[in-house]
């Protein structure tokens, strides 16, 4: 089998495995907490369950390898996004990261 065929066949499996491992890396309570925080503070701009954001980045597409960038953006704000560091505790921002990383599941 050529490398291209192998990649076509194996690629979706690897993507699924990556998503599953990201979800396993976070405790379900942390993801649930992140979901609640997201609904309260983020959904108005980023859309319910991160879908159809109005003028804000689509967080479903946020690079999963840029955790520090996410934490800093939420804490200190960026562009038109206000800073949330005074309102949210670090563990709450981490819970948001868990929620975003698991794709809202």
Give the role of each language-model region.
Residues 11, 23, 34, 59, ...:
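Generic anion/oxyanion-binding catalytic loop in active/binding sites
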Residues 14-16, 36, 68, 97:
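Intrinsically disordered, low-complexity segments enriched in small/polar residues
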Residues 28-36, 47-78:
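Gly/Gly-Pro-rich "capping" loops immediately C-terminal to redox-active cysteine motifs
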Residues 39:
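Residues immediately within or flanking Cys/His clusters that coordinate Zn2+
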Residues 53-60, 75-105:
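Axial heme c-ligation environment in periplasmic c-type cytochrome domains
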């Amino acid at each position: 089998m050529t490398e291209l065929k192998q990649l076509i066949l194996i690629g979706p499996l690897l993507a699924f495995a990556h998503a599953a491992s990201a979800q396993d890396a976070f405790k379900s309570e942390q993801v649930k907490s992140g979901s609640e925080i997201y609904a309260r503070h983020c959904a108005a701009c980023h859309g319910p369950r991160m879908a159809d954001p109005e003028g804000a980045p689509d967080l479903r597409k946020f690079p999963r390898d840029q955790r520090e960038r996410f934490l800093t953006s939420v804490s200190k704000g960026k562009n038109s996004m206000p800073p949330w560091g005074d309102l949210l505790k670090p563990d709450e921002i981490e819970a948001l990261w868990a929620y975003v990383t698991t794709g809202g599941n």
